[in-house]
């Protein structure tokens, strides 16, 4: 075969290959066109379906050929029971306290991703209990954790996670931008209250089921703040206490009644010479009792109780077993502020049982260390320092911090009474 014949043979072979390639490309285009036509026809067809369908479509270019990938996932609907938490039962009688959970966040944070937090608290619906907390917008052992000691900064947010779990970015739910907060569940949805903004113009943002439903503007323009523990719900209405004014003098205090995330009523307390901060509130027999912090001049704790119409009573726990920190040694109490060592304070709580009271307090009189529960059978109204029960919760050698109350409703516990519970913040 001479060179010319070789060239002609090679050319013929190339031409045949090219024609075959062209036919294949035409067939590919026809196939894609037919596929799109079938998809478009199917999109106009409607069929009844009892399941939720989510279709994800990813469009990808490969070798200049349009490929359509369609994945269909079938999701069964999760029905969440809704029930009004009545709050009409009385507190369960108790003779002691048992440990419910501990998150060990500081220890886990030495290796894991754990938020820098303060002001944690617990609140329960009829289905679950969650830990709420104020982050500093940083993780433990991270460069952004330096200097996270401010109570109020634009980086602080209210978040929540299942109770007993260390608060991390992987299990936590954003609730609100906040440096002061509260949250509670009315049996239908979570209500969250997050306060943020400048000291002279802070705003409380109310969310119900994650949606902003109302706001409360600072009325004294002096660091509006709230409970740092759960609000209290009765018959579908939730109640909270807020403070606006000096932390070392007479301030203004208001009770708010909230329904489905909207303020329906508020009352300003007529409370001269009283100081209410960071109240711990709970329902009891259809009414609300709040035990608070006096940061001005009392080493015993002030209280306010009110009904669902916001008719209220005020006072101080009379017991000579003092509940604040710093505080003097136990002695003779008063139903007015006990002045020795009365300045400053720490968030705390108590549970009232008739004339008796369970008092939670630090074991130390001058530092936030240790924690104990004391039963004073006439301490709500009596001024002596006699008590009948004492139970250690945190050893004197360990740090404590804020503490507060929360409850489990009969709709959750199955009891015929409201179970009183407490939490303690281990500051490090």
Swiss-Prot record:
Binding annotation for Ca(2+): 294, 298, 324
UniProt-annotated stretches for the region Head of neuraminidase: 91-428
One record GO biological process: carbohydrate metabolic process
UniProt keyword Transcription, yes or no: no
Glycosylation sites: 50, 58, 63, 68, 88, 146, 235, 386
Bilayer topology: Single-pass type II membrane protein
Record EC number: 3.2.1.18
Residue numbers annotated as active site: 151 (proton donor/acceptor), 402 (nucleophile)
Alphabetical keyword list: Calcium, Disulfide bond, Glycoprotein, Glycosidase, Host cell membrane, Host membrane, Hydrolase, Membrane, Metal-binding, Signal-anchor, Transmembrane, Transmembrane helix, Virion
Region described as Involved in apical transport and lipid raft association: 11-33
Intravirion side: 1-6
Disulfide bond entries: 92-417, 124-129, 184-231, 233-238, 279-292, 281-290, 318-335
Region of interest: Hypervariable stalk region: 36-90
Regulation: Inhibited by the neuraminidase inhibitors zanamivir (Relenza) and oseltamivir (Tamiflu). These drugs interfere with the release of progeny virus from infected cells and are effective against all influenza strains. Resistance to neuraminidase inhibitors is quite rare.
Major site of localization recorded for this protein: virion
InterPro entries assigned: Glyco_hydro_34, Sialidase_sf
Gene Ontology cellular-component annotations: host cell plasma membrane; membrane; virion membrane
TM segment ranges: 7-27
Virion surface compartment residues: 28-428
HAMAP family to which the protein is assigned, alphabetical: INFV_NRAM
SUBUNIT field: Homotetramer.
UniProt comment concerning the protein's domains: Intact N-terminus is essential for virion morphogenesis. Possesses two apical sorting signals, one in the ectodomain, which is likely to be a glycan, and the other in the transmembrane domain. The transmembrane domain also plays a role in lipid raft association.
Purpose of the protein: Catalyzes the removal of terminal sialic acid residues from viral and cellular glycoconjugates. Cleaves off the terminal sialic acids on the glycosylated HA during virus budding to facilitate virus release. Additionally helps virus spread through the circulation by further removing sialic acids from the cell surface. These cleavages prevent self-aggregation and ensure the efficient spread of the progeny virus from cell to cell. Otherwise, infection would be limited to one round of replication.
Additional remarks: The influenza A genome consist of 8 RNA segments. Genetic variation of hemagglutinin and/or neuraminidase genes results in the emergence of new influenza strains. The mechanism of variation can be the result of point mutations or the result of genetic reassortment between segments of two different strains.
Official protein name in the record: Neuraminidase
Organism: Influenza A virus (strain A/Chicken/Hong Kong/YU562/2001 H5N1 genotype B)
């Amino acid at each position: 075969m001479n060179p010319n014949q070789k060239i002609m043979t090679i050319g013929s072979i190339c031409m045949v290959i090219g024609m075959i390639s062209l036919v294949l490309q035409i067939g590919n285009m026809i196939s894609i066109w037919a596929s799109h036509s079938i998809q478009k026809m199917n999109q106009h067809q409607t069929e009844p379906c009892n399941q939720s369908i989510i279709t994800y479509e990813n469009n990808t270019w490969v070798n200049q050929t349009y490929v359509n990938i369609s994945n269909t996932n079938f999701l069964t609907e999760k029905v969440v029971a809704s029930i009004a938490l009545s709050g009409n039962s009385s507190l369960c009688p108790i003779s002691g306290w048992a440990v419910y959970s501990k998150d060990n966040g500081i220890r886990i944070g030495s290796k894991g991703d754990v938020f820098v937090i303060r002001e944690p608290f617990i609140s329960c619906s009829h289905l679950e209990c969650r830990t709420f907390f104020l982050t500093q917008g940083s993780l433990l052992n991270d460069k952004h954790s330096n200097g996270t000691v401010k109570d109020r900064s634009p980086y602080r947010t209210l978040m929540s996670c299942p109770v007993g779990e260390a608060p991390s970015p992987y299990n936590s739910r954003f609730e609100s931008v906040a440096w002061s907060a509260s949250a509670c569940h009315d049996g239908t949805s979570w209500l969250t209250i997050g306060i943020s903004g400048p000291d002279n113009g802070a705003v409380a943002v109310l969310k119900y089921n994650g949606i902003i439903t109302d706001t409360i503007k600072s009325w004294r323009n002096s660091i509006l703040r709230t409970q740092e523990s759960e609000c209290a719900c009765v018959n579908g209405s939730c109640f909270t206490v807020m403070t606006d004014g000096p932390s070392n003098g007479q301030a203004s205090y208001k009770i708010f009644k909230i329904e489905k995330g909207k303020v329906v009523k508020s009352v300003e307390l007529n409370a001269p010479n009283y100081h209410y901060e960071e109240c711990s509130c709970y329902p009891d027999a259809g009414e609300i009792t709040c035990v608070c912090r006096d940061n001005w001049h009392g080493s015993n704790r002030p209280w306010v109780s009110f009904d669902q119409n916001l008719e209220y009573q005020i006072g101080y726990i009379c017991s000579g077993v003092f509940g604040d920190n710093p505080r003097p040694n136990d002695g003779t109490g008063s139903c007015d502020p006990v002045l020795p060592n009365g300045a400053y304070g720490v968030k705390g709580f108590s549970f009232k049982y008739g004339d008796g009271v369970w008092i939670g307090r630090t074991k130390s009189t001058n530092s936030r260390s240790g924690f104990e529960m004391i039963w004073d059978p006439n301490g709500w109204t009596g001024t002596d320092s006699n008590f009948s029960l004492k139970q250690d919760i945190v050893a004197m050698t360990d740090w404590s911090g804020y503490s507060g109350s929360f409850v489990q409703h009969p709709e959750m516990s199955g009891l015929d009474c409201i179970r009183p519970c407490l939490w303690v913040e281990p500051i490090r």
